[in-house]
Swiss-Prot record:
SMART domains per the UniProt record, alphabetical: SapB
Lineage, top ranks: Eukaryota, Metazoa, Chordata, Craniata, Vertebrata
Tissue-by-tissue expression: Cytotoxic T and NK cells.
Protein's job: May be an effector molecule of cytotoxic activity. High activity against E.coli and B.megaterium, moderate against A.calcoaceticus and S.pyogenes. No activity against P.aeruginosa, S.aureus and Salmonella. Has some antifungal activity against C.albicans.
Signal peptide: 1-6
Disulphides: 50-122, 53-116, 81-91
Saposin B-type domain sequence ranges: 46-126
Protein name: Antimicrobial peptide NK-lysin
Pfam families per the UniProt record, alphabetical: SapB_1, SapB_2
Coiled coil: none
Propeptide feature: residues: 7-46, 125-129
Subcellular location: Secreted
Gene Ontology, cellular component aspect: extracellular region
Transmembrane residue ranges: none
Annotated organism of origin: Sus scrofa
Length: 129
């Protein structure tokens, strides 16, 4: 309910409702000491997950090479998370959930920031030229 007007697909809706760090090791040390820090913490976590997304997509683009096609993107996507060390769990979740969209965006030449905005992990930066 409500998805029809939100512009979100069911997969985007589930990710939007899920905490960006659910079960991810690198986020476990981010628990706030006091409840008033929750808003700041959420912004910091979103910043961390956005930065992680950009790093993962950049690594994927580097592995795909200068002339990507569906096969090279799929092959690179199956290997990229093993190269991400601490971001491996987040990488696998992103690839499992959004590979089709990421692949399409890479094939159209989008940059990592734009791809992470498309999959709703990063917010669009406003006011920048």
């Amino acid at each position: 309910p409500g998805l029809a007007f939100s512009g979100l697909t069911p997969e985007h809706s589930a990710l939007a409702r899920a905490h960006p760090c659910d079960g991810e090791q690198f986020c476990q040390n981010l628990a706030p000491e006091d409840p008033q820090g929750d808003q700041l913490l959420q912004r910091e976590e979103l910043g961390l997950i956005c930065e992680s997304c950009r790093k993962i997509i950049q690594k994927l683009e580097d592995m795909v090479g200068p002339q990507p096609n569906e096969d090279t993107v799929t092959q690179a996507a199956s290997r990229v998370c093993d190269k991400m060390k601490i971001l491996r769990g987040v990488c696998k979740k992103i690839m499992r959930t959004f590979l089709r969209r990421i692949s399409k965006d890479i094939l159209t030449g989008k940059k990592p920031q734009a791809i992470c905005v498309d999959i709703k992990i990063c917010k669009e930066k406003t006011g920048l030229i």
